[in-house]
A protein has these predicted regions:
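Hydrophobic face of amphipathic alpha-helices that form TPR/SEL1-like repeat modules
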Residues: 8, 13-15, 25-69, 392
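Conserved C-terminal structural/oligomerization subdomain of aldehyde/semialdehyde dehydrogenase
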Residues: 25-27, 31, 72-76, 260, ...
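Residue-level signal for inorganic ion chemistry
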Residues: 71, 107, 129, 151, ...
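Glycine-rich loop-to-alpha-helix module at the N-terminal edge of alpha/beta enzyme cores
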Residues: 72-161, 172
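Short, well-ordered beta-strand elements within core beta-sheets of diverse protein domains
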Residues: 73-80, 95-101, 187, 296-299, ...
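Structural signal for hydrophobic packing residues in well-ordered secondary-structure cores
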Residues: 96, 100, 115-122, 126, ...
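Rossmann-like NAD(P) dinucleotide-binding subdomain of oxidoreductase/dehydrogenase enzymes
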Residues: 163-308, 434
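ALDH superfamily catalytic-core signature
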Residues: 270-414, 437-438, 477, 526-528, ...
Length: 539
């Protein structure tokens, strides 16, 4: 058993070991100095955060946080009670009046401190993330870093949230707009990016002057909570950021609470559709980023080595558990001859625990996820797809109990097959072949999802044609995962998104603020009274 170090006196503690009596030992809470792990044979409990204080839930419903490579019990997480959810929302509501009047510069300085703290603790948080989610350490660091970029962008809110001004729109009349915060915002985040997705949400919401209630994934909340600890350490005031844990009941409570003004969601299509409908019916502003079936179109003139490396990395990285993972490869013309080389690349990838050096593909999040993936692979075989590379029976030495699925490739796939119509969310690539680029564009556009697509080519003309005619919100040219940097917005479309405005960039500032238009005319003593104006005109 490894040694656990404890926090210094006065530091916020969101991981608390269980004592023999079940009471909290406030002097021995896990800190940022160590990853959550078993203490004296009992797992630490994850706390709620309400009004700036760690709160032990009174619920009887606790779930286990399991290392997907080892099945080690890392912690237990509570499903918050209705009263605890209400307290968190009301804490955010009460904090809003003061926080919205906090000068923009003061909010920005908190974000500047926050980004420095996240950068300082990034390697340590990555170890926690890898342990609870299964990602390789390098990918876990990337998860955090892509979120860190959003914090950095939040430091520019002084220019991002500026309004507009036009003088003398009529005689002596000026019109200008203000961007003002909307109130309590809620965020519901998925298991596959426990750092990046929360950081898409609460830093931008808070720096815009809102307060926030976060519900992380119950499957891997530990790294998220470490990021929350750092936000409080950076100076986020009590009540401005709150955290509750749970499942559907918590989601529904946030979507229907009278004091919540906006809901941000990233996750599956089924849950995202439910969130959008329920929250919209209760008058909330909603952004819902959902499932995907991302295609990569390969032209024969593409750089062969670069393309194959990109496809293998985008298809099998993070064990395929990315909403922007490449899941379908469309070979155009003679490029279908590259399939054996793609299989060879996939065979070279090392499947192991994310903590092991040199690992390329870690485990999937849970035994249930593995069982679902394997069932879909069986369906693919039954439907007649060719199992070109079979990762179903992989065993990892030293981690025989891990939730591993090896890189898997199906060829001869058709659009009618369930494996094509369903987001598998595992290390599985489907391969299709078409004669022309026009056929490829038609194929991709006929799929209901619209998160991302890639084109691999050396032809500028082909690339321009593709980006113009493809009906997908995010396009990569010789880039397999076209997730924009935070200066631009995440613009997934069609069946992958509900709501007009996406995460981060300019769109999220619009989402987290409301526009107020002011039309003003000032008079002095010399102003001549023009009499009563009964028309709509400004004169």
């Amino acid at each position: 058993m490894r040694t656990v170090r404890y926090s210094r006196q006065g530091q916020l503690n969101l991981f608390v070991p269980r004592s023999g009596t079940g009471h909290i030992n406030q002097e021995s809470a896990l800190s940022m100095n160590a990853s959550p792990q078993t203490i004296s044979g009992t797992p630490p409990k994850v706390m709620l955060l309400i009004d700036g204080k760690p709160v032990e839930s009174s619920t009887r419903d606790w779930r286990e946080v399991i290392n997907p490579a080892t099945q080690e019990l890392l912690a237990t997480v509570p499903f918050a009670t209705a009263d605890e959810i209400d307290r968190a929302v009301r804490s955010a509501h009460e904090a809003f009046e003061k926080w919205k009047r906090t000068p923009v510069g003061a909010r920005m300085r908190i974000m500047l401190r926050y980004q420095a703290l996240v950068r300082e603790h990034l390697p340590r948080i990555a170890k926690t993330l890898s342990a609870e989610q299964g990602k390789t350490l390098a990918d876990a660091e990337g998860d955090i870093f892509r979120g860190l970029e959003v914090i950095e962008h939040a430091c520019s809110i002084g220019s991002l949230a500026q309004g507009e001004f036009l003088e003398n729109v009529a005689g002596g009349v000026d019109t200008y707009t203000l961007r003002q915060p909307i109130g309590v915002c809620a965020g519901i985040t998925p298991f596959n990016f426990p750092a990046m997705i929360p950081l898409w949400m609460f830093p931008m919401a808070i720096v815009c002057g809102n307060t926030f209630v976060l519900k992380p994934s119950e499957q891997d909340p530990l790294s998220t909570m470490q990021l929350v600890e750092l936000a409080i350490e950076a100076g986020v005031p009590p009540g401005v950021l709150n955290v509750v844990h749970g499942g559907k009941e918590v989601v529904d409570a946030l979507c229907t609470h009278e004091l919540v003004k906006a809901v941000s969601f990233v996750g599956s299509t089924a849950v995202g559709t439910h969130v959008y409908r329920l929250a919209s019916e209760h008058g909330k502003r909603v952004q819902s980023m959902m499932g995907a079936k991302n295609h990569a179109v390969v032209l024969p003139d593409a750089n062969r080595e670069h393309t194959l490396n990109a496809l293998a990395g985008a298809g099998f990285g993070a064990a395929g558990q990315r909403c922007m993972a490449t899941s379908v490869i469309v070979f155009v013309g003679e490029s279908h001859q590259w399939l054996p080389d793609l299989v060879a690349k996939a065979k070279l990838l090392k499947v192991n625990a994310g903590s092991e050096p040199g690992t390329d593909v870690g485990p999937v999040i849970s035994r249930a996820a593995k069982a679902r993936i394997l069932a879909l692979l069986e369906t693919g075989v039954a439907e007649g797809a060719t199992l070109t590379l079979d990762g179903r029976s992989i065993s990892v030495r030293g981690y025989e109990d891990g939730n591993f699925v090896g890189p898997t490739i199906f060829s001869d796939v058709t659009t009618e097959m369930q494996i094509y119509r369903t987001e598998i969310f595992g290390p599985v690539l489907l391969v299709m072949s078409v004669p022309t680029l026009d056929d490829a564009i038609a194929l991709v556009n006929s799929n209901p999802y619209g998160n991302g697509v890639g084109l691999f080519t050396s032809s500028g003309a082909a690339a321009r044609k593709f980006q113009t005619e493809i009906d997908i919100g995010q396009v990569g040219i010789n880039i397999p995962i076209p997730v924009p940097v935070p200066y631009f917005s995440f613009t997934g479309s069609r069946g992958s998104k509900l709501g007009d405005l996406g995460p981060y960039g300019k769109q999220v500032v619009q989402f987290y603020t409301q526009t107020k238009t002011v039309t003003a005319r000032w008079f002095d003593d010399a102003t001549v009274n023009d009499g009563v104006n009964t028309t709509i005109s400004l004169r």
